Regions:
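A long, amphipathic alpha-helix that forms part
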Residues: 2-9, 17-50, 64
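Extracellular/periplasmic catalytic domains that process cell-envelope and extracellular macromolecules
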Residues: 3-7, 45, 73-77, 138, ...
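Structural recognition of the beta-strand scaffold that forms the well-ordered cores
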Residues: 10-14, 52, 83, 135
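Catalytic metal-binding/acid-base residues of hydrolase active sites
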Residues: 16-18, 56-57
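Extracytoplasmic/periplasmic, Sec-exported soluble proteins
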Residues: 21-31, 73-74, 91-98
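Feature representing long, continuous alpha-helical segments
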Residues: 30, 34, 38, 79, ...
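Histidine-centered active-site microenvironments of extracellular/periplasmic hydrolases
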Residues: 47, 53-88
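Membrane-interface soluble catalytic domains
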Residues: 85-194
């Protein structure tokens, strides 16, 4: 069988959970858990890296389409992020992370790449986080800096600015933290320029 042969094998399962009531969502999660279990039972974990994550979370807030597209509440941006490989020690990362942190983790910890992370990725190694003070999320309109305490700073291309606290309540703030935005965009631009 293809799955038991000693050849490289890759699988990508694109699961799309429709916008449903909470109880149907929970039922869908149980079905996904079973699909993951079935998939893992069909491959040899001796030479397999398993990564389980999601593009975004699910909010049950009543939002219209435009509000949903621009929503960065914790329920929407916090996702599962599980990495398994037989030679990785079991650990739980509780610091603020981003999907951009996966590639540096794989390249440094599994594939033993010695180049500086900045040569090939924007993120940080998940397994060697050193307390960086923010992650960046974005959509077609907003760039959002998220700090470990949950504070979010949103800015768009037209200079529109919003600040939210950890509960995603908009805060009164007339001046964006320009130094922080400049640091973030400088770091992002330095990677693109390479």
């Amino acid at each position: 069988s293809l799955l038991k042969e000693d050849k490289p094998w890759f699988a990508y399962v694109d699961l799309d959970i429709a916008d449903q009531a909470e109880e149907n969502y929970i039922k869908s999660l149980a079905e996904i858990d079973q699909q993951i279990d079935d998939t893992l039972a069909s491959v040899s974990l001796d030479n397999t890296i398993v990564i389980i994550t999601a593009e975004h979370g699910t909010t049950f807030n009543k939002l219209d389409e435009k509000a949903r597209e621009n929503y960065f509440g914790r329920d929407e941006i916090q996702v599962p992020f599980i990495v398994y490989w037989k030679d990785l020690p079991v650990q739980e990362v509780t610091k603020l992370t981003s999907h951009t942190d996966l590639l540096p983790a794989l390249m440094s910890s599994i594939f033993k790449v010695k180049n500086p992370v900045s040569d090939y990725a924007q993120g940080r190694n998940l397994f060697e986080l050193n307390g960086d003070p923010w992650v960046l999320a974005s959509n077609f309109r907003w760039n959002v800096i998220i700090q470990p305490d949950g504070t979010q700073y949103h800015i768009d291309r037209k200079g529109n600015y919003k600040k939210f606290d950890r509960t995603y309540t908009e805060q009164s703030s007339s001046r964006p933290p320009l130094g922080l935005f400049l640091d973030v965009f400088k770091q992002e631009r330095s990677f693109v320029n390479k």
